[in-house]
Regions:
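Membrane-interface interhelical loops and short amphipathic "cap" helices
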Residues: 1-18, 78-87, 142-147
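Terminal transmembrane helical module of multi-pass membrane proteins
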Residues: 108-176
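Interfacial segments of alpha-helical transmembrane regions
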Residues: 46-63, 119-127
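Interfacial helix-start motif at the membrane-water boundary
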Residues: 11-32
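C-terminal TM-helix exit segments that contain a strictly Trp-centered aromatic cap at the helix terminus
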Residues: 64-76, 133-143
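Membrane-proximal helix-loop-helix units in multi-pass membrane proteins
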Residues: 66-107
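Hydrophobic alpha-helical segments of membrane proteins, primarily the transmembrane helices
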Residues: 24, 28, 53-56, 60, ...
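Hydrophobic cores of alpha-helical transmembrane segments in multi-pass inner/ER membrane proteins
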Residues: 26-37, 96-109, 157-170
Length: 176
């Protein structure tokens, strides 16, 4: 397995070693936790429609998306040419695309609601922009030898934003 040239989903694709352990022991629970993170962030104060919409996007896109992708794994090699894909591959790809379209935009929406916190705004905007730019790059280069690296930049931006939000929310003793 090569992290820079293979999709993350190839770790748990059909016929991959330990795919069920990775799917059900790693990705499924992490998706549920991302969904819970988003729901708890919505319930925190101060409440706003903008924040609620943004966190629904993060929860649906990243949380629910990870759950769906763990249940519907991709075909062996993740079939980037999309030649005779299985139903599981089709669902996996559609959910992955929705995730990478929705989550950067959702982070940006949340960022708009916290302009008063300049540092959080600046880092959130940067992470949202980078994840969106790399999402476009990934979709333009599905055959690239660096597609795994590109995907990991997207994932890293999203995960860094979740940590960033958590740190800022905990420092202020309330959600941002």
């Amino acid at each position: 397995y090569h992290h820079s040239s293979q999709f993350i989903s190839e770790l748990y694709a059909v016929d991959a070693p330990n795919s069920d352990l990775i799917r059900y022991g790693g990705y499924l629970p992490s998706g549920m936790l991302f969904l819970l993170f988003s729901l708890f962030a919505i319930w925190e104060k101060p409440k706003s429609k903008t924040k609620t919409i943004g966190f629904l996007g993060v929860g649906f896109g990243y949380g629910f998306g990870t759950v769906i992708c763990s249940i519907f794994n991709c075909d062996a090699g993740c079939n980037p040419e999309f030649i005779n894909p299985s139903l599981s591959q089709i669902i996996h790809n559609l959910m992955g695309l929705l995730t990478y379209l929705i989550v950067p935009v959702s982070i940006f929406i949340i960022t708009l609601d916290v302009k008063q916190n300049k540092r959080f705004f600046k880092y959130s905007f940067l992470l949202a922009a980078l994840s969106f730019i790399f999402m476009i790059l990934l979709n333009l280069s599905l055959q690239s030898h660096y597609k795994g690296l590109i995907q990991r930049v997207i994932e890293g931006c999203i995960l860094c934003w979740i940590v960033l939000y958590s740190v800022y929310a905990s420092k202020s003793n309330k959600a941002i």
